[in-house]
């Protein structure tokens, strides 16, 4: 079928991690400028496995997943604003309307193609040496030994700091006091908003990190490819170009506001400045916080930014568990919504914690400012005794290591 797909503009141009990670190339310059200038919401249809906004391309907000034949059909139609079951997808050379049903193969046709072209031997042959890798992979020099030989100059793999303060004792459970709101987010914030896996912008904190090390923009690669380097990943946390921090008005992207300076900066830079001042930070969010793929770096990056707690209306199950696993406190509003709280960047947040912490216990969160002092009833979303042990150990990684050292 390749020659017919080529005629339609569907060329086989390579293989690898491309469209679903945002690596399939830029839009035509004029089209991209038109989208930005007019703030258009444009759509893509893809047969990949990710449809987060801005993921396929930073200019494309709406992405729809479909089978490969439907991707071709929508491309022929040129719009997602049609009903494929009743609207024509194009006009043939004789001026007749063409419908999806006219070009859609029936089961018999599909079965005949499969029987002629697919066999068990194909899979046996391809998978028999799959773990050997191509010649290029086999030529890579590797070292052996019990301990990994960290290369301090590598921009792909760096020694992570999760065990730097490892202790055999549980951390002291004490109140979170005078915490600054780092972000105020809405509903259905995905793990891709929290820790994007796509392209790295040159003017982002991660981009600056590479530029300081003389890495060319063409060699930035993606956040997904750089997940072995915590310095890149922490700079990419909350750096999605489509995230909306409601502490700032009419601003899209990974920005926050530094208090009391009232200075707009990247989320990373604000978090690092608060860390220098030894000030705690928290995140506020609406419903379904952390929905989407179960991305470990969404919790790891949150931890490395110094975020002590995420206060939300509700949590996605796996991300909530991952936050606990990194020693970050998930706190769920009991009867309020985020909008009820009218959170401001100048507020100070206090969460009352004691040594006798229990799973799913009620917590009191106090929001303070010059104008108000309100108490909010919340629920601790550490759901089990095991999770409580992880939190007390400052995360599951430290918990596991502590038990290994004990034994």
In which residue ranges do the predicted regions lie?
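Short hydrophobic alpha-helical runs that function as membrane-insertion/retention elements
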Residues: 12-14, 308-313, 330-333
């Amino acid at each position: 079928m390749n020659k017919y797909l080529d005629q339609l503009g569907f060329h086989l141009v390579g293989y690898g991690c491309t469209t679903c990670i945002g690596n399939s190339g830029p839009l035509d310059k004029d089209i991209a400028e038109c989208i930005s200038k007019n703030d258009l919401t444009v759509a893509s249809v893809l047969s990949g496995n990710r449809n987060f906004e801005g993921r396929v391309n930073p200019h494309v907000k709406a992405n729809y997943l479909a089978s490969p034949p439907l991707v071709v059909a929508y491309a022929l139609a040129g719009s997602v604003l049609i009903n494929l079951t009743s609207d024509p997808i194009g006009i043939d050379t004789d001026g007749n309307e063409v419908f999806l049903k006219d070009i859609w193969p029936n089961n018999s046709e599909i079965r005949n193609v499969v029987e002629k072209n697919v066999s068990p031997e194909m899979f046996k042959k391809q998978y028999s040496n799959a773990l050997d890798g191509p010649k290029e992979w086999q030529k890579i020099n590797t070292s052996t030994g019990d301990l990994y030989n960290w290369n301090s100059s590598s921009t792909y793999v760096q020694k992570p700091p999760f065990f730097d303060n490892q202790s055999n004792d549980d951390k002291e459970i004490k109140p979170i006091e005078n915490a600054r709101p780092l972000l105020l987010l809405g509903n259905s914030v995905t793990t891709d908003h929290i820790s994007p896996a796509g392209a790295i912008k040159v003017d982002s904190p991660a981009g600056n990190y590479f530029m300081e090390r003389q890495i060319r923009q063409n060699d930035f690669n993606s956040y997904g490819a750089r997940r072995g380097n915590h310095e890149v990943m922490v700079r990419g946390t909350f750096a999605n170009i489509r995230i909306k921090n409601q502490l700032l008005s009419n601003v899209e992207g990974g920005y926050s506001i530094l208090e009391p300076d009232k200075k707009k900066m990247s989320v990373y830079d604000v978090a690092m400045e608060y860390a220098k001042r030894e000030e705690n930070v928290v995140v506020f969010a609406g419903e379904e916080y952390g929905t989407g793929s179960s991305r470990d770096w969404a919790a790891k990056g949150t931890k490395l930014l110094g975020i002590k707690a995420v206060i939300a209306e509700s949590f996605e199950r796996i991300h909530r568990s991952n936050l606990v696993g990194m020693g970050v406190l998930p706190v769920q509003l009991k009867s309020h919504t985020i909008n009820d709280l009218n959170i401001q960047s100048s507020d100070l947040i206090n969460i009352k914690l004691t040594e006798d912490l229990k799973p799913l216990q009620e917590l009191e969160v106090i929001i303070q400012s010059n104008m108000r002092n309100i108490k909010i009833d919340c629920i601790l979303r550490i759901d089990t005794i095991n999770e409580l042990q992880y939190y007390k150990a400052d995360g599951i990684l430290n918990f596991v290591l502590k038990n290994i050292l004990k034994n």
